[in-house]
């Protein structure tokens, strides 16, 4: 099965896993997904993730989802820039997600980072997704 948008598939897996109260979900491997998972871990939205492999060529991530008092920590996670309509912004025009309570994950020339770090570094880029 070919995926036209693996990032959207990854975000949907997280959303569905949290709605069904799963402790662990399995998502496909890519460098972009790895970078997004590192940001989600550093910001406290997930408990952790590990890289696994079925064979030498098939890799995937096991993601430990985080809950607080029985409720999912991630209340909203959405794809912003889509394959059919890309969304770019400069560092000075970068919006804040829920007035700074949430975060945007941005693909910049210096790598994938949160909106706060992109503003701090003075770089803009493609807004991949928003997390609240």
Swiss-Prot record:
What are the record keywords, sorted?
Ribonucleoprotein, Ribosomal protein, RNA-binding, rRNA-binding
One Gene Ontology MF term: structural constituent of ribosome
- State the source organism's domain of life: Bacteria
Q: Name one GO cellular component term.
A: ribonucleoprotein complex
Q: Which Gene3D superfamilies match?
A: 3.30.1370.30, 3.30.1490.10
Pfam families registered for this protein in UniProt? Ribosomal_S8
| Family annotation (InterPro entries) | Ribosomal_uS8, Ribosomal_uS8_CS, Ribosomal_uS8_sf
> Belongs to which family?
Belongs to the universal ribosomal protein uS8 family.
Q: Which NCBIfam families does this one have?
A: PRK00136.1
- Record protein name field: Small ribosomal subunit protein uS8
Organism in which the protein naturally occurs: Ehrlichia canis (strain Jake)
């Amino acid at each position: 099965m070919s995926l036209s948008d693996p990032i959207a598939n990854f975000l949907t897996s997280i959303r569905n896993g949290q709605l069904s109260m799963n402790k662990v979900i399995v998502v496909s491997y890519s460098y972009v997904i790895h970078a997004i998972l590192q940001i989600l871990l550093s910001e406290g939205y997930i408990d952790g993730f590990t890289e696994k492999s079925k064979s030498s060529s098939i890799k995937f991530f096991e993601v430990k989802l985080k809950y607080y008092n029985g409720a999912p920590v991630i209340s909203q996670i959405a794809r912003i820039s889509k394959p059919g309509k890309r969304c770019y912004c400069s560092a000075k025009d970068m919006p804040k997600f829920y007035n700074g309570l949430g975060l945007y994950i941005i693909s910049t020339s210096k790598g994938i980072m949160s909106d706060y770090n992109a503003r701090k570094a003075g770089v803009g880029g493609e807004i991949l997704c928003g997390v609240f």
